[in-house]
Amino acid sequence: MARLMIFIMLILASGCSFSEDDAEENVVYVYNWGDYLDPATIEKFEEETGIAVIYDEYDTNESMYPRIAEGAVHYDVICPSDYMIQKMIDNDLLQPLDFDKLPTAKKYIGADFFEQSKTFDPENKYSVPYCWGTVGIMYNKNLVEEPVDSWKILWEEKYKNEILMQDSSRDALMIPLKLLGRSLNETDTEIIEKARDMLIAQKPLVQAYVVDEAKDKLISGEAALGVVFSGEALMITLENEDMEFAVPKEGTNFWIDSWVIAKDAENVDNAHKFIDFMCRPEIAVINFDHLGYSTPNIAVRDLEKDEEWKNSPVAFPDPEIYQNQETYKYLGNEMDRFYNRQWMRVKVE
């Protein structure tokens, strides 16, 4: 898929297929997480609209942000997480959406999720929820004997070289902050440094700091415990029946990834068309089946044909699981840099 998109980009750049004006009318540049939608939905969009999708991927919010801020590539549609959307709004990197051009989004994206989005998009002007979930511990029942109900298990010596941690500053530091009884949006530098030191102390036990690799390692049995997103958890349990997912009692992150349009987008109408297309129930269910991530689309559960997925407590959890969880907030550029420095300290120690 990536090679196909690069090929299309080269054609556009060379002017072989489109004039400059035509390219603006017949293309949309999308920047999304790795493997975060079914390629078939892009093909359906292109076939129906005649708009070519130039698709690029990133692995973390932090790696995505500089490319947008520096303006090296002018993407149209992006899919950041909650706190990163707030940061992009604060730094004038997004443009308000025209919801008159998003009728499907207004009809099928649950009001509860727009309400939750107000924590990072206070007026619901900039974002349309795409996926949501929690962060928890995936564990192998055959390798882990005790109940998994606390983040503390990730510091157990007996699981040395069996633990996978997220390679992301906020997702990694969130865990010791919760063990300390603090908010995952902590701004007290001494507390954050204490959380950093806990991660440094844990480091000899960690097999790897990973992003997308966690799923394959856990499915294959290469690790006994891993910090994963709930959508990955559903896919892992389907591939390996020995795996289970737990949300620790200390609390965790309730996250929302949403579609936004970049401030310097050159294909704004096409960007709206792309977002609204992805909100169609019949398209959303294809992406749900591909990803396993919980969806804010209120029609998907009824359309889902797989009874195991439809009744999955991971994909459609009891509201008690996430009602009292926190959403990441953007804490300002200075605090953002501070978090990143502490995470780099962990990585280099």
Task: Give each language-model segment a name.
Residues F18-M88, D216:
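Early extracytoplasmic/lumenal segment of secretory-pathway proteins
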Residues A262-Q323:
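Mature extracytoplasmic/periplasmic domains
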Residues I192-A201, Q207, E239-K263:
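Periplasmic-binding protein-like
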Residues M1-V27, E349:
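Short, low-complexity disordered leader/linker segments with a strong preference
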Residues P319-E349:
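Conserved C-terminal helix/tail region of periplasmic/extracytoplasmic solute-binding proteins
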Residues M84-K87, I219-S220, L225-D242:
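A ligand-binding cleft/hinge motif common to bilobed small-molecule-binding domains
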Residues G136-L143, K178-L179, W255-N267, I275, ...:
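A bilobed periplasmic-binding-protein/Venus flytrap-type ligand-binding module shared by bacterial periplasmic
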Residues H74, C79-L205, V210-E222:
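Extracytoplasmic ligand-binding site segments that recognize negatively charged/polar headgroups
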